[in-house]
């Protein structure tokens, strides 16, 4: 593709003449010098710990001769320099152009909020697929479409990877993609040039605030709101206290859903259900001026109802067959989200991704409605993040749990025991028994060993993840595998 076509719409200052830009043939875009090669554009991005401008010489050695920079630095004479105000924004626009604006050729649904993004995105894939709309997913659990499964490093990948993935989906016959849109992805302008048809807002709590993420809650909230400047339709949880802010800052048509307030789509008559391998809920929902409709889902709690309402609202926007999408929604499940593992015949074991105070509180309060004999909860907190998350997790467990097993989550380069001790500070006036075990596998073994008839064991924090970050390295770790193996050892010993 000609360079002039790739940089179409980009504001820049260049050392090259216009006819030169028309003549240069480009085969790819690189933003990592290790992946750079001949006939590629190298985009120098200033990251949190690494500055791409420091690796321009490496990209040059690997054959790059076109460089996008946001500092007026000196380059070799045979190089084309494109000076821009923001290289991240430039990468987004160029990636969109390079892959021939793929998001204009597919329905794109963006999901943002502190919690619910993964569940809603995966619900949408299940429901839309069964409704006859071939759908893909980009998010925390990975990239999925047709028979393809791929991994993602970030919840919302870099803009080049997004447009590349959507291009592949379009070429593979995918008609719709549900994408998790994180505040970081919005802040780092990864989705600037994605053509969103629908944006969904779930909720907001003071998470992802700290030196490595958002400096303030106001910045976090602002970044979330930017999705609704990129959409045709916005679907908003009206019960969330920040919903008015999202609506006021939106540039799109808004539809609302709720359980408490009057909205375009409201749930009523909620009841919990239970089977051997599933916890769920039934409810009625009412569209303005319509007759109530009864439906069910295979996940418990109000937060699951909110997720379901977001999916129903989306299906209505897409004008899908009600019978098909409600039938699919009733069966939909998400890996590692309030997932019951039927490993002990006398106790209920649940694995969940809850890793902040708001999520853990929602999960525990929902599960307590099933009136377990004891609530045993295993959890930890990540390293390198604001300490407030540890406090919030600890306070929730101190209030709601009979036994709290504090262990390792993703300690990164922090001392795991220090993180555990920080959480333990919240239990001074609590009736909850506290057990500290650094090794997460050993902690799981302990949690299942102490479980007795009617107890509920919640293993929180990892869910679907197959890794831990320890000492700056990503190491393999399979939460569900550890639970299954621990239970097998216990049952073998008991027999």
Regions of interest found by a model, annotated:
Residues 10, 91-238, 242-253, 309, ...:
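Phosphate-binding loop of NTP-binding sites
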